[in-house]
Amino acid sequence: LVKHIKSLSDENFNTDDYTCFLGRGAYDHYIPSAIDQLILRQEFYTSYTPYQPEISQGTLQAIFEYQTMISELTGLPVANASMYDGASALAEAAVMSCEATRRNEILIANSVHPESRQVLNTYAKFRNIIVKEIQYNNGQTDLDDLNAKINDNTAAVMVQSPNYFGIIEDVEAISEIVHKNK
């Protein structure tokens, strides 16, 4: 029975034999073997966020050491490693872009994960930031729509690659459009 089921399953394409671009966050992930040992350290068994400093000293120490190392590697005076996840990091980057450029419009590809776009809209709602979505064509960011929407008030153009549909975006073409319209 096991051999029969295995022979049936072998008729399917699988991610062991083919490159996977399923999208929606379903990708092959490489996890270095050192991680298995590091997660066993006691300081990582504390809470997810260091809101209770008295029981999160290990997490705070690890964040401090990481930030210090990144600062030394990059030569920058400061580094920050306290973003929750990709969606909040995207939203924080949008806010920083608006503050740095003194512009208040963000263009985000409609092919970015919907939950990330929702988080961005939540951040933007009370900050006078206008979020406009760039449509997609055949699963990729529509470059004509980007060209039509980018303007002097655009603080940032945000894309995800591979995108929500698992398609690699033409980041080089997007970058050319953005730099042409600085």
Question: Predicted segment positions?
Answer:
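N-terminal entrance/gating region of PLP-dependent enzymes' catalytic architecture
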Residues: L1-E65
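Structural signal for hydrophobic packing residues in well-ordered secondary-structure cores
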Residues: I5-D16, I39, Q67, S71-V78, ...
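Short loop-beta-helix segment that forms the pyridoxal 5′-phosphate
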Residues: D17, Y51-I55, T59, S71-A91
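A glycine-rich phosphate-binding loop feature that marks nucleotide/adenosyl-phosphate handling sites
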Residues: G23-D28, Y84-S88, N137-Q140
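Gly/Ser/Thr-rich helix-start
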Residues: R24, L76, I167
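Noncatalytic linker/hinge segments flanking ATPase motor cores
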Residues: T59-I63, I70, E176
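Amphipathic coiled-coil/heptad-repeat helices and related helical stalk/stem segments
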Residues: I63-Y66, G86, D142
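Conserved PLP-enzyme active-site core in the AAT-like
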Residues: S88-K182
